[in-house]
């Protein structure tokens, strides 16, 4: 009976000492995980910000392309069809209805003044 008590006491002491080591190890492991979790949270917070910045950069790039393409249209040369309501004939030209050879056409053309 004495050996049973000694064996039980020995097993109990080993369990407690190993349990403490596991507890310390678990605590350190939890600290590492929380530190990593914080870095993941920072990364997760920055990720949408990065996506928004990329989207903003794309939109600004499109705006700059639009501003490049929004320049005034080129003028229309002599003998080219034009719109009577919105003539874009070059300087020195006027948008007129064709005479003689172009009567059958239903559009206006740029002619010299």
From Swiss-Prot:
The keyword Cytoplasm does not apply. It comes from Cyriopagopus hainanus. InterPro entries: Toxin_22 (IPR012627). The keyword Signal applies. GO terms for cellular component: extracellular region. Disulfide bonds join 75-90, 82-95, 89-110. Expressed by the venom gland. The presence of a 'disulfide through disulfide knot' structurally defines this protein as a knottin. It is found in: Secreted. It comes from the Eukaryota. Probable ion channel inhibitor. Belongs to the neurotoxin 14 (magi-1) family. 01 (HNTX-16) subfamily. GO terms for molecular function: sodium channel inhibitor activity; toxin activity. This is U11-theraphotoxin-Hhn1a. Residues 22-74 form a propeptide. Residues 1-21 form the signal peptide. Residues 60-69 have a biased composition (Basic and acidic residues). Keywords: Disulfide bond, Ion channel impairing toxin, Knottin, Secreted, Signal, Toxin.
């Amino acid at each position: 009976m004495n050996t049973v008590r000694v064996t039980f006491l020995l097993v109990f002491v080993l369990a407690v000492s190993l349990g403490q080591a596991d507890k310390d190890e678990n605590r350190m492991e939890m600290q590492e995980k929380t530190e990593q979790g914080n870095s993941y949270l920072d990364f997760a917070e920055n990720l949408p910000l990065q996506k928004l910045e990329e989207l903003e950069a794309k939109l600004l790039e499109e705006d700059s392309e639009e501003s490049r393409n929004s320049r005034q249209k080129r003028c229309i040369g002599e003998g080219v069809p034009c719109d009577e309501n919105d003539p874009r004939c070059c300087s020195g030209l006027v948008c007129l209805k064709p005479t003689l050879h172009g009567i059958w056409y239903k559009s206006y053309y740029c002619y010299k003044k």
